[in-house]
Design a protein with these regions (language model features):
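Signature of multi-pass transmembrane helix bundles
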Residues: 1, 14-19, 141-224
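Juxtamembrane helix-boundary/capping and inter-helix hinge elements in multi-pass membrane proteins
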Residues: 6, 10, 14-22, 48-56, ...
Length: 224
């Protein structure tokens, strides 16, 4: 993270802010928010656990869009120097109201998974990038409270996936059939381990590849 995602976040944040193009800043932050979330290993694990009630791809991109939208809100908070407490209070009230609606509809078992999805924003890829992005934007904008203004981005982004998954849960049907994984050593340990490594490597390379390609295009077209 220190070698890749943190410098990338600072570079993107400062470069886009210097362009003075708010629409471009919002669009890029949304896309990067989606891509870094999709690349999170934690999200893949969560999606596999609830595949019986929600399609894994739908859940992954729903959470990604939630993070992307709230990353945009967090960035706009920095740009317009709005109160973090007021924004958090408003969206928490919305979140609890939607949670009550899920309970009324009889899908209370859906809520733990929805709130657990917020943990994706504490992953090893997402956190360094979001924090560095905020620091880069706040430092470029400047001002007496630049450091304080960049505070709270991860807290805001954690709301996005929770709200997104709760919205999925309002009309969801079925039951969560979670089974504890079998951690016993298989007879063909080497073959099983190799298969798992190859499968995981493919997922990680695909997700990180999207980030690399998007950053390369951004570097050539906007940040040059």
């Amino acid at each position: 993270a220190d070698v890749a995602m943190t410098p990338m976040g600072e570079h993107v944040g400062s470069g886009l802010t210097k362009s003075k193009n708010l629409l471009l800043l919002v669009a890029v932050c949304f896309i990067m928010g989606v891509l870094i979330t999709v690349a999170e290993p934690d999200l893949t694990v969560l999606a596999s656990q609830v595949a019986g009630i929600i399609d894994s791809t739908v859940l992954i991109f729903t959470v990604g869009i939630g993070v992307g939208l709230f990353l945009v809100i967090a960035i706009l908070k920095i740009v317009f120097k709005k109160s973090l407490a007021s924004i958090l209070m408003f969206f928490y009230m919305v979140m609890f109201a939607l949670s009550a609606l899920v309970i009324i509809n009889g899908n209370i078992g859906f809520l733990p998974m929805a709130y657990d999805s917020g943990g994706v924003t504490t992953g090893p890829i997402t956190v360094p990038f979001i924090m560095a992005l905020g620091v880069g934007i706040a430092a470029t904008i400047g001002g007496r409270d630049a450091e304080e203004n960049s505070f709270g981005l991860v807290a805001l982004c954690s709301i996005g996936p929770i709200l997104a998954v709760i919205l999925l849960g309002i009309d969801a049907s079925g039951t969560l059939d979670y089974q504890i994984p079998d951690y016993a050593i298989a007879d063909h340990f080497l073959a099983a381990t190799l298969h798992l490594l190859v499968h995981t490597a493919k997922e990680v390379l695909l997700a990180l590849g999207l980030i690399v390609v998007f950053f390369a295009v951004l570097q050539v077209t906007v940040l040059k």
